[in-house]
Amino acid sequence: MDVRPKKQASPKGQTPKPQAQPFPLPAPIRGWWLSSNLATPEPQTALALDNWVCTTTGIRARGGKNLYATLGDPVASLFTYKSGAIEEMFGATETDIYPLTVIGDPLVTPAADVTLQTSGSYSYTQFGTAGGDFLVLANGADDVLNYDGSAWTTPAITGATSADLSAVWTFASRIFFVEGDTQSAWYLPVDSIAGAATEFSLSGIFTKGGSLLFGAKWSLDAGDGLDDKCVFVSTEGEVAIYEGTNPGSASDWRKVGLYQMPKPMGKNAFIQAGGDLLIATDVGLIPISAAIKTDLGAIEGAAVSRPITPYWQRRSRELAATRWEVIKSAKANYMVISQPDDVDPTCLVVNLQTGAWSRFTGWDTQCLTYFSDLGYFGSTNGLVYQMEVGGSDEGELYTATYLGQFENFGAPGQQKTILQARPILVQSTISAPQLTFQVDYDETLPAPPSSAADSTTSTWDGALWDDGPRDSEDAATVAAEWVA
């Protein structure tokens, strides 16, 4: 980019000769950043970064969405089952569970595997025993469900009321449950998917009231070993951490501590990432390791989402009654956080390696899952979509927007004139980028540009002569020095 300072008064007899100066503006590889000082913005960041994915070398435009399946009613949950080479996906509405592994016609609703349910708000985990691998579901309104790769069954659980169990996780070769709207957890015998459940009450542990919301295993070394902790999280953000393998044994079960976090955004709003457990709260995406060594008043500074704190906290207030979800993809190298019931459908994206944030717009992400290396989301219109497939949102165009931080170009207080600019893009198809400049901290964006002409060619002997598009011959690019 060439920038020329505005002409200034010069001594008598001299003719001012302002010189244009080039200034490079590197790609915002550090992502969307709203928490910096306007006068000293963070380098290589952006004030707006919609429909981009941050990489270690630049940013890339996201892929489109593709209709995968129709469930008819709003999609409440998506979950997967995997055993050996077998991998299956399911989707749930408030009343039914549907198989989604193989879809013939995406416009035709498949036959439901499970019907007559009263809630689609499922918590789920997978558990292996000598009898096979099982997908375990709990929703706090219907009996617990197990899937073994061929059939859904209701396990015989005694001691607790199966329909009251609202969340599920595994720890130390046991299945644990949350009893909804209480401060009690229940656990089954070792290596069992059914049987007598034993209560583990936290009513004398939690001090802020509320109820137990979810539990999880926290692996400090990103694996499965002796350093694993069992974490119990309340609706008020209290976190009770235990270690051991048998909650019924005083010698083999010990409380590590009770810690305070901000309030979580749902029973599925957490994920294991490396050696930490990340929890989406009303303040930000908080590592549990920060909760055990940081005061609640200062924990915001330890949030993984600190660059977008103003946006995150505004959305958490507006969507406080919704159930956020967090998923990650090692292949795509990013994590996705849903924001259900958002009137402006969006989801948040963060690079797993660099922590750089961006936002996907136009996606009604009510629930999320990954299946066969592809992301999927369910929407309020009863449809399930594949994420980052193709170049349009089900035939509709979308715009990738990047607004950089405001720059003084090394001359604060001086007026500048933008003479010309050249973006550097690497692309496999023709695009129609629009380049504009904003001044004086005006973040108002112009209308999106028109789409580029279709650069695809016709199949030989498959189009009308002089009607189908011809080979655009744009594969080769001539490199030359840029001259102003």
Where are these predicted regions, by residue range?
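Beta-sheet repeat architectures centered on beta-propellers
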Residues: D2-P110, T115-F134, Q260-D276, D282-A484
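Structural signature of WD-repeat beta-propellers
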Residues: A92-T93, N139-G140, E179-G180, S234-T235, ...
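Short, solvent-exposed loop/turn segments at conserved positions within beta-propeller repeat blades
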Residues: D181, L226, S234, D341-D344
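Surface-exposed extracellular loop regions of Gram-negative outer-membrane beta-barrel proteins
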Residues: F232-M261
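Beta-strand-rich, repetitive solenoid scaffolds
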Residues: G91, L137-A138, N146-D148
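Asp-box/WD-like beta-propeller blade repeats and closely related beta-sheet repeat scaffolds
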Residues: D148-A172
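Structural signal for beta-propeller blades
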Residues: I97-Y98, D143-V144, S184-W186, V239, ...
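Solenoidal tandem-repeat scaffolds enriched in leucines and small polar residues
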Residues: V168-L226
